[in-house]
Structure formats: C-alpha cells, structure tokens
Amino acid sequence: MFIGIDHGTTAMRFSSGDAEFKISREEARQFSAGDLTRLSPLDEIEGIAVCYSMGDGIPAITDIRKVLDRGVVSREGAGKHIGGGTRVYDEIRASGLPAVVIPGLHRGSPTDPRFKAYSHQASPEKIGILYEVSRDLGDDVVVCDASSNTVTLLLTAGRITGAFDACVFAPGTQHGALDVDAIRRIDRGESTANDAFLHAGVDHTMPPDLRVETMAMFAAMECASMLLLNPGANVALAGSMAPAIAPRVKELLSCDVTVYDEWCAARGLARIARDVFTGATDILGLAVER
C-alpha cells in the first residue's frame, strides 16, 4: 500500500488511491502515525509521499531520513502557520515508515531558467496534482489549481517546464499578489507582507458578484501564458474553485478543460510514492534521491 499526503491550505488529505480521508490543519496538530490505519494496516504500508510547506530546501524527491529542516529554507514566508503540517511530517518521520519528501519548485529546481525570475514557483502538493493529471491527459499539460490561492504549472514532454506561484499572478479566493495599495500599507506599518498576501484574494478585493468571473479570467490568463510555451498542451483545472470557473475558462481559452476534484493532489502523491518505491529514478523531471 502506498500513501500520498497533501499539505493543503485548509486541510491535510491522505489517500491510498483506493481510500482517503482528510482533517483540518488544526485537527492535524493531534495527528499520530496510527491514524494511517484508516487507510491501511501500518505493516502493509510500503511507502509514503509527504509534502511540507514550500519545499524550497530540496531540489529532488528525497528519503525523509536524509532531509534537513523538513526540506524548507525557512518556515517564514507567504502562508498560514498553524502547526498541523509540522505535526504530520514529524510523526511520519519518527514512525520509521518508508517515506519520501516531495520538493517544491524553486530556483534550485530543474525548470526552465526563465521561471527563476521569481524565487518560488509552486509548493510540493502541486507536483502530485500534475502527476495525477498527466496520467490521464498525457505528457503535455497545463494545470491550474484554483482555490484559496491560484497556481498554474506546465508539463512539456513529460518534464516540468515551470509554474506561476500563488503570490505572483492570479488571485485565489483568499490569497494573491501584492498590489500598490498592499505595498503602501506594508510601508506604513499597517500590515505585514504575509498578512497582505493572505488578504489579497478575490473574497477580500472584489464584490461578490464578480469573484468567480475574476478568478476565471485570471486562471485563463495563466493557462494562456503557459500555452505560449506549449500550444498543444491539454488544459486541466483542480482545486475547490475548479467546477465554478471551468465553463468560463473553457470559453475564454476556446478549448476543452478537464476538471479534477480536491483529492487530485493526494491521489497523485500516492501514485508518486508507488512509482518511487518500485524503482523510479525520475518523476516529471525531478530526480529521486534515496
């Protein structure tokens, strides 16, 4: 049995591919490795793929026992700090169960160097989404994950080309890029940069009747930007907002759009765990270090 663990913005999702469960990040502060018996007896778990925060401290899929500082440069940065993800990671590591840590995409990643104009491109769970989607749609794919924040990735010939991170381009419902007003509030000492990021989504910046339309427009723009680099790529949407924005994104892009549910990342991570622990040396262009 192989398990994928999605460290999402609002919840932790656990999947074996056949069974799954989720807990809030607050509930995750009480997690123990024994909770995995909801998916499988512990002695039948052959491998786990774990995500933690931004994953910017490692460039490769790495044995959890070899990862320092949970695979991050710092816990500071853009996002909520609750403690649930830390608890899950530490419990898995202490359990002795075979596990690998999935990296995020950053300047140390083997992506198109032009994307490295920004320090960070995507957090680790997005790799799970891309892996799951590529199984269905092939080796040339654009995937936009639209929920609390919006992140879009491009796969070309089976290798990750690059991604637009949550704080760079399209807003999500809660989080987004910092605009001039946000920068001014920060400079006046009225807000931290992280708090500004956490309140830059459409739920904070747009009237209710324009929120879905706005997210759809920006999601389509991110996808269109990626299609400049790979015009023949298939397009998919994931995340909690995917069903709501899909019709408009399809209309704006004039192409078919495949929609995935909230379990896409965890299922893809379970698939990564299976492939890594059965001998894969490369996942979407990311090396595997055992």
Predicted regions: what is each one?
Residues P231-V249:
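Glycine-rich phosphate-binding loops at beta-strand->alpha-helix junctions
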Residues M1-F21, G138-A163:
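Gly/Thr-rich phosphate-binding beta-strand-loop-beta motif of the actin/hexokinase/Hsp70
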Residues I5, I48-V50, P98-G104, A122-S123, ...:
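General beta-strand structural signal in soluble alpha/beta enzymes
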Residues P110-D140, A157-P207:
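Glycine-rich phosphate-binding loop plus the immediately following alpha-helix
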Residues A244-R248, S254-R290:
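Glycine-rich phosphate-binding/hydrolytic loop that grips phosphoryl groups
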Residues D43-Y118:
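Short beta-strand-loop/turn "lid" adjacent to the catalytic site in phosphate-handling enzymes
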Residues M1-R65, A94-S95:
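N-terminal glycine/serine-rich phosphate-binding loop of ATP-dependent small-molecule kinases
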